[in-house]
Curated annotation (Swiss-Prot):
Residues 209-478 are annotated as: Shikimate 5-dehydrogenase. 3-dehydroquinate binds at S21, E29, M30, R31, T55, W56, K57, R171, Q196. It comes from Chlamydia muridarum (strain MoPn / Nigg). Keywords: Amino-acid biosynthesis, Aromatic amino acid biosynthesis, Lyase, Multifunctional enzyme, NADP, Oxidoreductase, Schiff base. Pfam families: DHquinase_I, Shikimate_DH, Shikimate_dh_N. HAMAP family: AroD. CDD domains: DHQase_I (cd00502), NAD_bind_Shikimate_DH (cd01065). Residues 1-208 are annotated as: 3-dehydroquinate dehydratase. The keyword Lyase applies. The gene is aroE. This is Shikimate biosynthesis protein AroDE. NCBIfam families: aroE (TIGR00507), PRK09310.1 (NF006802). Its EC number is 4.2.1.10, 1.1.1.25.
Length: 478
């Protein structure tokens, strides 16, 4: 159940926040400690809410006696739920329950530390409590996933959420984790706790279609330059696929623990970005022929506990070149970089009859790819010395690339759309294919692997168009 937090601070602001959210939410938490309203006005807000939660965070200067008195006065307003800190006296909870038997009690704990939530729950357990809320602070994505795993072992009357930016995915996954409450804020309001998402954000992530039976799709690696969450979630919604797509920042060092976690959680598909495309291969149960050919993996499919790796990067770029009527036979093609995407592209283009030239800052890495696909390897500084028909840039946007020209330039980076290399090439009259085109094509290939029973040919153009618009918008914002 979505629960929108009302913080005001004035009565008028609080009422507007509540009324603005009523179409999308029925449950509202009134933060009495943040509201500058009278008890009569607070009562009006409670009556406006179909389901109400009343919370008052005890300030450090408040005495135990004053705390109890304040909570007793709030109980007299008859909210649906009363949220009490874990340290609120047990005997006073029993007294409130005796006087107000219809009020349901939530016992909550917020901590800035990452702690074993099973132990926390055990410490909070009491017969007088209806619901429990645990808010903890994960230090990493693997911490986050371990917390999600632990949540499955707790009773269904327990809400577990993670604070901070790292913890945002736990809020998106809340219905899948069977949380009784999913806390959100009115659209346009400031967060009350770090990592809170707006009501519109939750709807964007397909909240109304999510349930404990839903599966999860995600992006792992350096997620900072991806627009995948902005393209994939609306696409899933259009197809009525009850699945969110979340970003999970991950380093190579975290892979062992990550793979333990995803086997215990309902993951269906995972996109893999740098720097994990080659590092991830030893953890796969099976490799598709595309991975065996390229030595790179950008797609995981999880079925019946088995993790299968695929590579759609090279095929995605080849689809783009085909759409642009680019015939590569007997052409000289330069690939800049020696990472996972460069490997994938070299593997696919090696079957087109073109002559491949691999350029990299560390020549030995270029040689490793070249030897595999009968290509030539060069230091990146030698790029201007070679005449080619096509340059495919697989280096990061911040890379310093020698000024070189070709009739057609492909830059596979989605964000930023423009960089010094493409700007120079465009100034000199070269045709440019930007990264959002390859992004869209490789993603559509991933969707076919994740959702083989769905037909979405009619939506492909809209998906590609959305990727193009987002890449342009983010470049303008930058």
């Amino acid at each position: 159940m979505l629960c929108t937090i009302i913080r005001g601070p004035s009565f008028l602001e609080a009422r507007n926040q509540l009324l603005r959210s009523l179409k999308k939410c029925r449950c509202f938490e009134m933060r009495a400690d943040l509201l500058t309203v009278s008890d009569a006005e607070l009562q009006k807000l409670i009556l406006l809410a179909p389901i109400s939660v009343l919370t008052w965070k005890k300030p450090p200067s408040c005495t135990p006696q004053a705390w109890v008195k304040k909570i007793q006065s709030l109980a007299k307003l008859h909210p649906t739920y009363l949220d009490l800190d874990k340290d609120f006296p047990e005997e006073e909870i029993l007294h409130i329950r005796h006087l107000h038997p219809n009020i349901k009690i939530i016992r909550s704990l917020h901590t800035s530390e990452h702690t074993d939530i099973t132990q926390l729950y055990t410490q909070m357990l009491a017969s007088s409590i209806d619901y429990y809320k645990l808010a903890v602070s994960p230090a990493s994505t693997t911490d986050l996933l371990n917390i999600c795993r632990q949540k499955h072992s707790l009773p269904q009357n327990t809400t577990v959420l993670c604070l901070g930016k790292i913890g945002q995915s736990s809020r998106i996954l809340s219905p899948i984790l069977q949380n009784p409450f999913t806390y959100t804020i009115p659209t346009g309001a400031d967060p009350v706790a770090p990592g809170q998402l707006s009501l519109n954000h939750h709807y964007f992530y397909n909240f109304t279609n999510l349930s404990p039976q839903s599966q999860i799709c995600a992006l792992i690696g350096d997620t900072s330059r991806s627009i995948g969450h902005l393209t994939h979630n609306p696409f899933f919604s259009q197809l009525s696929i009850p699945c969110p797509y979340v970003k999970l920042p991950l380093t190579p060092q975290e892979l062992p623990e990550f793979f333990s976690s995803i086997r215990a959680l309902p993951f269906l598909g995972i996109s893999v970005t740098s720097p994990l495309k080659t590092a991830i291969i030893p953890f796969l149960d099976k490799q598709d022929s595309s991975v065996k050919l390229s030595g790179s993996c950008n797609t995981l499919v999880i079925r019946q506990g088995e993790i299968i790796g695929y590579d759609t990067d090279g095929e995605g770029l080849f689809s783009v070149l085909t759409q642009h009527n680019m015939d590569l036979s007997n052409q000289r093609v330069a690939i800049l970089g020696a990472g996972g995407a460069a490997r994938s592209i070299a593997a696919r283009l090696s079957r087109t009859g073109c002559e491949l030239l691999i350029f990299n800052r560390t020549k030995i890495h270029a040689e490793a790819i070249a030897s595999r696909y009968q290509a030539q390897a060069f230091d990146i500084k030698d790029l201007p010395l070679h005449s080619v028909s096509l340059i495919i840039n697989c280096l990061p946007p911040s890379s310093i690339i020698p000024q070189a020209l070709a009739p057609l330039i492909v830059d596979i980076n989605t964000l930023p759309k423009h960089n010094s290399f493409t700007q120079y090439a465009r100034l000199k009259g070269c045709s440019i294919i930007y990264g959002h085109e390859m992004f869209a094509q490789q993603a559509l290939l991933q969707f076919r692997l994740w959702f083989p029973t769905h037909s979405f040919n009619h939506l492909e153009k809209n998906f590609s168009r959305r990727a193009a618009v987002l890449a342009s918008l983010f470049s303008i914002a930058a």
